[in-house]
From Swiss-Prot:
GO CC terms, sorted: cytoplasm
CDD domains named in the record: ArgRS_core
Protein name stated in the entry: Arginine--tRNA ligase
Gene: argS
Motif ('HIGH' region): 138-148
MF-aspect GO terms: arginine-tRNA ligase activity; ATP binding
Major subcellular site: cytoplasm
Family annotation (SMART domains): Arg_tRNA_synt_N, DALR_1
Assembly with partners or alone: Monomer.
Domain of life per record: Bacteria
Swiss-Prot/TrEMBL catalytic activity: tRNA(Arg) + L-arginine + ATP = L-arginyl-tRNA(Arg) + AMP + diphosphate
Species of origin: Nitrobacter winogradskyi (strain ATCC 25391 / DSM 10237 / CIP 104748 / NCIMB 11846 / Nb-255)
Localization: Cytoplasm
Length: 597
């Protein structure tokens, strides 16, 4: 039986005890030896009145044990009731086991938080494994718009979450600077260059980028080249103008991302795949051809819905169907150039060659149909050693008081990311972009996200952190020597009699703190940072509820002027809450204010 785990927290501890109970039964012959215990989970019960934790151990082992789940549960419960951590163990329904832990356990949880501070919840489950998270990767053809915003925030938060869970993360941006869209960018910039020289260019022709953001590119070209390019043939100026425009657009994009506290470690140019000393796309196609995964052939006409890249001709094809895709995929266009898919295969091969066997790509909703072919390609180029998880982020509907927001004049046909950040701040944007699962459409209301109410999640969570520090400031009437510095304050409060925290509301907060490390690990494993946002809102809600309770019931107030012991214990609880709120907000890239203005 296997029960090894890098997890070090209360839920992992209880899971290990369940494993040991099963191992003891196996030694006694009451369970077969060699059972896989990986399917056993220990989680919070759906109904808090049923206990502190629940396990499915009997349910998942019953078949292999050739026993009824309830009968097996009885045997497991007998072992668990003898455990020094467990107050009671009861069987529910068809064989679930509900566990209630002894009260001193919760004081120990708080001691862990006070010891680790904002580091509480950090995990080693990643074991230093290298992970490449690619996100944003917007075409370098203009400023970031609100549609890019969600993927940028999601990818950045996921990278932070994976780092917090012990992975060695590289954050990557793939610059799409080799497709036809950058030639359109160059022609659009050339028009602005002529405008900068004094020419009346009139209306921007259809097919070119109309936004005013290209005017500075035109002005820079005019300043650097005068009118020397005006009469030159396109073949002479296209590459020069394209490089200048891409460079200035990427500078703009980096600024947009910085405004939202988005960072990347690597900016990888698509053009570098073919413009360097070697044509890496050709090398990749050759590599796959040697494996028998590339051939010259003709695709049959598509059945039902048309395939967007279908052409009835002899062409170079990747044998995608051998790796789970629906059809084989073209690697070259009719003009002899590479398809975007061919470049994508080569790009992902470079990731694998750089040591990334674990890859995550964050894509927009319009790329959903592209997943199978890229995953098939990765299986082929890595001989099954590489994995790719594609996270699709759905659309963002930008509203103000429930009404759609008008488009940006500067950008031409969209609302820029910078405009949104300047209006509501990066914290509101980041938290709200994560307060819904990535594959669900998100309504982002500019009016709602600046409201100071429970209905505004980012305010409610940040206010929870600020409220904790307000309590600390007020507590100096009882403890004038309560330290300002975090580490010293945690040490000061760590000497409190934490067992005095026995009210159901206080114990509820302690249980919620105990859940944080498990939430971190589950969110990291599922690549779902929204779980952290949901957790923080729940924690803040319970904290605010306890504060409100104390306003109505004086004996539950955090500060009791004539009882220094209970005040110190409750301040320790407040310290635990603000530490975890700060930890989670940091993972999400959101500030944890000590006061709200």
């Amino acid at each position: 039986m296997t029960d090894s785990s890098p997890s070090q927290h209360l839920f992992a501890d209880v899971l290990a005890r369940v494993h040991r109970a099963c191992a003891a039964l196996a030694e006694e012959g009451a369970l077969p030896s060699g059972l896989d215990l990986a399917r056993i989970v220990v989680e919070p019960p759906r109904d808090a009145s049923h206990g502190d934790m629940a396990t499915n151990a009997a349910m998942v082992l019953a078949k292999d044990a050739k026993a009824k789940p309830r009968d097996l549960a009885e045997r497991i419960v007998t072992k668990l009731r003898a455990d020094d951590l467990i107050e009671s163990a009861d069987i529910a329904g068809p064989g679930f086991i509900n566990l209630t832990l002894k009260l001193p356990v919760w004081a120990d949880v708080l001691r862990d938080v006070l010891r680790d501070g904002e580091g509480y919840g950090r995990s080693a489950i990643g074991a230093g494994e290298k992970v490449n998270v690619e996100y944003v990767s917007a075409n370098p053809t203009g400023p970031m718009h609100v549609g890019h915003c969600r993927g940028a925030v999601f990818g950045d938060a996921l990278a932070s979450l994976l780092s917090f869970a012990g992975y060695d993360v590289t954050r990557e941006y793939y610059i799409n600077d080799a497709g036809s869209q950058v030639d359109v960018l160059a022609r659009s910039a050339f028009l602005r260059y002529r405008e900068a020289l004094g020419e009346d260019i009139g209306e921007i022709p259809d097919g070119l980028y109309p936004g005013d953001y290209l005017k500075p590119v035109g002005q820079a070209l005019a300043a650097g080249h005068g009118d020397s390019l005006v009469k030159a043939p396109e073949a002479e100026w296209l590459g020069l103008v394209r490089a200048k425009a891409i460079g200035m657009m990427m500078e703009m994009i980096r600024g947009d991302l910085a405004a939202l506290n988005i960072r990347h470690d690597v900016f990888f140019s698509e053009r570098s795949l073919i413009d360097g000393s070697a044509d890496r796309v050709a090398e990749t196609i050759g590599f796959l051809r040697e494996k028998g995964d590339v051939y010259e052939g003709r695709l049959p006409p598509p059945k039902g819905a048309p395939v967007e890249d279908y052409e009835d001709r002899e062409q170079t094809l990747f044998r995608a169907t051998a790796y789970g895709d629906d059809v084989d995929r073209p690697l070259k266009k009719s003009d002899g150039g590479y398809t975007y898919f061919a470049s994508d295969i080569a790009y992902h091969k470079t990731k694998f060659d750089r040591g990334f066997h674990n890859m995550v790509d964050v894509w927009g909703a319009d790329h959903g149909g592209y997943i199978k072919r890229v995953q098939a390609a990765i299986k082929a180029v890595t001989s099954g050693k590489g994995t790719l998880d594609v996270k699709i982020v759905q659309l963002v509907k930008l509203l103000r008081n429930g009404e759609p927001v008008k488009m940006s004049k500067r950008a031409g046909d969209f609302v820029t990311l910078r405009e949104v950040v300047e209006e509501v701040g990066s914290d509101a944007v980041r938290f709200m972009m994560l307060f819904r699962k990535n594959d669900a459409v998100l309504d982002f209301d500019l009016a709602r996200v600046i409201e100071q109410s429970k209905d505004n999640p980012v305010f409610y969570v940040q206010y929870g952190h600020a409220r904790g520090f307000s309590i600390f400031r007020n507590a100096r009437e009882v403890f004038p020597d309560l330290p300002e510095a975090d580490a010293e304050r945690r040490q000061f409060l760590g000497t409190a009699d934490l067992e005095r925290l026995s009210d159901p509301a206080e114990l509820g907060l302690l249980r919620k703190l105990a859940l944080y490390p498990r939430t971190v690990e589950a969110a990291a494993a599922a690549h779902e940072p929204h779980r952290i946002a949901f957790y923080l809102y729940d924690l803040a809600s319970e904290f605010h509820a306890l504060w409100t309770k104390g306003r109505d019931l004086p004996h539950l107030r955090f500060i009791i002027n004539n009882d220094a012991q209970i005040t110190r214990a409750r301040l320790a609880l407040v310290q635990g809450v603000v530490a975890v709120l700060a930890s989670g907000l940091t993972v999400l890239g959101v500030h944890a204010p000590t006061e709200m203005r």
